[in-house]
Amino acid sequence: MFEIREKPEMVERAMLVSIYFDPSEAGEKQAMLDELEDLVSNLGIGIAGKHLIKSRDMHAKFLCGTGKAQEVKQLALDCRADCVVFDNMLSPSQQREWERLVDECVIDREEVILDIFARRARTREATLQVELARMQYSLPRMARMWNHLDRQGCLLYTSPS
């Protein structure tokens, strides 16, 4: 059964991670990671660590190879982070795999931005727009939530007549 790990109400320490593949992207990725630090700080969350991870190839499961994924897991344990925040856009399956690996909540940049908008929405219309954006973001992440019911047999109802 698939389990959605909810963000704790109060995340105190987050570890920031940015994965890049081309060495020429390192400077740009560092700048984006610094910007992500400011975004996360705006939510009142302390930064436990910032890590720029170089990966040779893009992999479907974790975005990086399993060796680099284990390295990120160890870094999260070492800095005692409550949450791992990725600068990269994670697919729903990648987010699930990371949550299983690090056993903490895992979010990406888009979710951080949605949280900031949600906190700053003042009007009813703004609140509804943010809620719609959150639902659109969450929908693919819930797609496999009820898989445990897929293999249950169909109950046929027959009338007594």
Which residues make up each language-model segment?
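Canonical P-loop GTPase G-domain recognition
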Residues: 140, 144-148
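Short alpha-helix plus adjacent loop in nuclease-associated cores
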Residues: 112-130
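Conserved small/polar residues in nucleotide/adenosyl-binding loops
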Residues: 157-161
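Short E/K-rich amphipathic alpha-helical oligomerization segments
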Residues: 147-156
